[in-house]
């Protein structure tokens, strides 16, 4: 079943495999994902599951949200996410059903999507890995500047999309082909090898790897 789930980044640690080697892992908490809507070709033009997870204070829930959750018969969660379905996936899943981390028990690799850490306004060296200029040898003002950004008298302008200084991070990022190290269904935890995007407690979308 190639269906994704919504999880929360707990943090990183390490575990030791059977050979005694240290394996860096990210711990992802995947509480039960409650299905709030099933989208079909007939009604929506495409197939998808809309899910929620976690909890939300009652005074933070808007009336439209409250009605939507009540119609589905599920507890209000901290957000709504939509997971596209390929042909043959998700058959038999109905509104109100719960999806748990054990659906990854037979999967070896996953893709993890999250929002990267925001780093504010950064220069070209940090943002785009530009080469720094000389620290000495006559250079006294342009050690970390971008260098030439223009053309000639023609076209006499800077092309759109030119890599320059600007806002870095806080964008949707996907890390692909992460190995699943352990699936702990009792504690709703998924351990994947390596790092995943975002800060601690950030929401993540975990899907079976498309390039596995």
UniProtKB/Swiss-Prot annotation:
GO terms under biological process: translation
GO CC annotation, single: cytosolic large ribosomal subunit
Modification sites for N5-methylglutamine: 153
UniProt modification remark: Methylated by PrmB.
Swiss-Prot/TrEMBL keywords: Methylation, Ribonucleoprotein, Ribosomal protein, RNA-binding, rRNA-binding
Family: Belongs to the universal ribosomal protein uL3 family.
Its job: One of the primary rRNA binding proteins, it binds directly near the 3'-end of the 23S rRNA, where it nucleates assembly of the 50S subunit.
Quaternary structure and partners: Part of the 50S ribosomal subunit. Forms a cluster with proteins L14 and L19.
Protein name: Large ribosomal subunit protein uL3
Organism: Shewanella piezotolerans (strain WP3 / JCM 13877)
């Amino acid at each position: 079943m190639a269906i994704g789930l919504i999880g929360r980044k707990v943090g990183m640690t390490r575990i030791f495999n059977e050979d005694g080697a240290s394996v860096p892992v990210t711990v992802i908490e995947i509480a039960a994902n409650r299905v709030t809507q099933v989208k079909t070709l007939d009604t929506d033009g495409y197939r998808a599951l809309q899910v929620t997870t976690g909890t939300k204070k009652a005074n933070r829930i808007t009336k439209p949200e409250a009605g939507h959750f009540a119609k589905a018969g599920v507890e209000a969660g901290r957000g709504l996410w939509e997971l596209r379905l390929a042909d043959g996936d998700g058959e038999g899943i109905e509104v109100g059903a719960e999806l748990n981390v054990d659906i990854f028990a037979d999967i070896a690799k996953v893709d993890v999507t999250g929002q990267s850490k925001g780093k504010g306004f950064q220069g070209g060296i940090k943002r785009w890995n530009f080469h720094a200029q000389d620290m000495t040898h006559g250079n006294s003002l342009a050690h970390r500047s971008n260098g030439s950004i223009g053309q000639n008298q023609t076209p006499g302008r800077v092309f759109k999309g030119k890599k320059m200084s600007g806002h870095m991070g806080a964008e949707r990022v996907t890390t692909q082909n992460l190995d699943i190290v352990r699936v702990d269904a009792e504690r709703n935890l998924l351990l994947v090898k390596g790092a995943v995007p975002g800060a601690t407690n950030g929401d993540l979308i975990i899907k079976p790897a498309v390039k596995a």
